[in-house]
Design a protein with these regions (language model features):
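C-terminal terminal-subdomain/extension
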Residues: 3-4, 76-132
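Short, charged beta-turn/beta-strand-edge "cap" motif at the junction between a beta-strand
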Residues: 25-29
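Compact nucleic-acid interaction/catalytic patches
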Residues: 32-34, 40-75
Length: 132
């Protein structure tokens, strides 16, 4: 087992920075799939009112660690193994896909996540920077 399990109730409140085990199937092409941890990225107001969540998948396969959208984290937030958050794979999931709560990432880790989201969405690119 790679994470702790916490049973979710019907009145569960999702929070930004939370980790959940979610069923990412069905998928297409290069999208992350299967039952895997996801990190909630959406703001807490959206988490409360919307039936969906904005998430990033988490994997224990630490390939391409040097990408500006891959954040390697240690055994944190209920994860039992070093893992990598793939912030180029941000997607929307229905809350019903979340199977159980794993834990929450630290404020310091979420600050790093925020920087990588800016990279992923092109929010840090200056006018003179261009893609190859």
């Amino acid at each position: 087992m790679l994470y702790r399990k916490h049973k979710m109730r019907d009145d569960w409140v999702f929070r930004r920075g939370d980790l959940y085990l979610a069923n990412m199937n069905p998928f297409k092409g290069s999208e992350q799939s299967g039952k895997r941890p996801v990190l909630v990225l959406q703001n807490n107001a959206g988490n409360f009112y919307a039936p969906t969540l904005i998430v990033a998948p988490v994997t224990t396969r630490l390939y391409k660690q040097d990408l500006p959208t891959h954040l390697v984290i240690g055994k944190e937030g209920g994860l039992y193994e070093r893992s990598m958050i793939e912030l180029e794979q941000i997607r929307v999931l229905d809350k019903q896909r979340c199977m159980f709560y794993i834990g929450r990432l630290s404020k310091q880790t979420m600050e790093k996540v925020d920087e990588m989201i800016k990279n992923s969405l092109g929010l840090m690119i200056t006018e003179d920077m261009e893609a190859p």
